[in-house]
Swiss-Prot record:
This is Uncharacterized protein OsI_009114. It comes from Oryza sativa subsp. indica. On the 2D-gel the determined pI of this unknown protein is: 5.1, its MW is: 18 kDa. It comes from the Eukaryota.
Amino acid sequence: MAQNKTIAVALLLATLVAVMGKEPETLEEALRAGCKEECSEQKKKAPIDEKQREDFCFIKTKSIFEAHKGVKDLKADRFIDFCNNECNAVYKEDPATSKKCAESCEADAKEAEVFLDKVVAYMQTTKQA
């Protein structure tokens, strides 16, 4: 379970890096391209099909951007709310997939929160030095 969370966080962070490294025409194009690239490398490790994996990645990455707007301290609950709302909107006709998407959001959010807390702590110690 911890390995899956680590993989999910690595996927999310790699997607963010991929998004920042390219110059697409829209944010959506950038997110989808990054997710497609990262998901193709991870397709053997998750029990969902490739299209769903890309869609979930896109939803989670978009949600983390939206949740972070105007907020200095992003907490898991805020990300989970944004992500769950997006899952419900995208999969409103398919409650089972919406639930899988929301569960994926929650797992990634908690893992990402721990990582982001460590990054913030590190940044604060380097500012003081």
